[in-house]
Curated annotation (Swiss-Prot):
Gene3D superfamilies named among the record's database cross-references: 6.10.250.590
Keywords, in A-Z order: Hormone, Secreted
GO biological process, one term: mRNA stabilization
PROSITE patterns for the chain: GLUCAGON
GO cellular component: extracellular region
Record-stated family: Belongs to the glucagon family.
Pfam families the record matches: Hormone_2 (PF00123)
UniProt cross-references to InterPro entries, sorted A to Z: Glucagon_GIP_secretin_VIP
Name the record gives this protein: Vasoactive intestinal peptide
Length: 25
């Protein structure tokens, strides 16, 4: 199901953004 794939990719993307913010701070 495309929605499930999108949600999985989006959550992974959010984690990466959070990790970058954490490392840059």
């Amino acid at each position: 199901h495309s929605d499930a794939v999108f949600t999985d990719n989006y959550s992974r993307f959010r984690k990466q953004m959070a990790a970058k913010k954490y490392l840059n701070s």
